[in-house]
Amino acid sequence: MTEADRSPFSAPNTLDSGLSRSDQEDVAGTSAREWKTLFAPMQSNAGPSSSAATRASIKRANTTESSVSIRQQQVRGRGGPPRGRGGRTQASRRLLDASDAAASSPPSSPTDPVSRIRHKIVTTPLPPDSVLTPTGTTYRSVVWKLLLDIRDLDVAEYLSLVAKGKSPSHDKIRNDTFRTLATDQGFKERVKEEKLIRLLDAFVWKHNRSDDSADEADADADVYEFSYVQGMNVLAAPFLYTLESEVEAFRCFSRFIEYCCPLYVQPTLSGVHRGLQLLDRCLELLDAPLYHHLRGKNLSAEIYAFPSVMTLCACTPPLPEVLQLWDFLLAFGVHFNVLCIVAQLHIMRADLLESASPMKLLRNLPPLDARKIINVTVTLARDIPADLFQDLVKHPYHPDSVAAFT
């Protein structure tokens, strides 16, 4: 075995990779029982109509001193009211300027509901949609709303945005929506194209600034510019597929875009390009032989990983595995997607090193294996230096991190 063939990664144990069908069914049954046990004391949490006690526990979860929660607050602006039309409040400005913790890892001893959910996501996949919570909803729909801190729904707002009809970006939206997860029959049956168009048009109207006053059109309001850009159709798809209603999907999608990855949807896709740059840095650090093999074939992340970074891996089937990966990204931050892509490269490592034309393999990635990717990613994160990890954390949302790309 040559030095280039020797992987620097340890092989983590996975929960469901390589199992027979019957074994996978047993794992799914165990998963459902574990999540049902976790949710039993939290039945009142299921949805925006949660009790005051539940809201208080979620608020405590949002302000915990764990490094994971601190980072998620910084990424999402959690708990602060979103400002419409692309602006940000004074509170969110302070949030963006706050210093990051030096490291991030799954909570070791979760004590509040949201922390317990995050911990469980790392160890146990969420049950399939056929398994419902005690309140009759899917586990994933409840978990995503809790992780995104969705406390209420404004149905009237969504209806008013939909009533505006075609947005200024309608033609661009229509050019993309018919291609969204086109090979996934389950998605096409559950999410009709008109729903996706309606949600994206409403998002554009929500941030349309044509009628802004001069006072609102100041430098502070121009930090983020929200409209429709390439890839947003794919980012919206998992929300429409997962959430119980279109209004819930719109609320979660809006929160996700505005707080988790606003720089990924700027006109220049600055956050995406920064993520690709960081992917190259991480791969060179974690697996120099593979990095130099790809660079020797003139392959940088900009060439082979653009779709995976832009869509947070949602462009790679199958959809159920994408949703499992997104459980992890929503729990610990979308910045982890960069390391998830490095993990995929590790899984393909032997084939890539043996190939004289690795781009042929990278152009058609193997099906996602979410549990394996998550386990490898958690292992990789331990070897990332604090300064590089801080760059990873900030790149989806902090304007300073993409100054060179604007």
Segments (PLM) and residue ranges:
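Extended, Lys/Glu/Leu-rich amphipathic alpha-helical scaffolds
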Residues: 94-95, 113-116, 248, 256-304, ...
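Hydrophobic/aromatic-rich, well-ordered segments within soluble, folded domains that form packed cores
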Residues: 141-147, 228, 308-332
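Short sequence/structural elements of tandem HEAT/ARM alpha-solenoid repeats
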Residues: 191-195, 251-252, 270, 320-324, ...
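Eukaryotic basic, amphipathic alpha-helical target segments in cytosolic regions
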Residues: 43-46, 151-155, 181, 185, ...
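Secondary-structure capping and boundary motifs in well-ordered enzyme cores
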Residues: 135, 224-228, 245, 249, ...
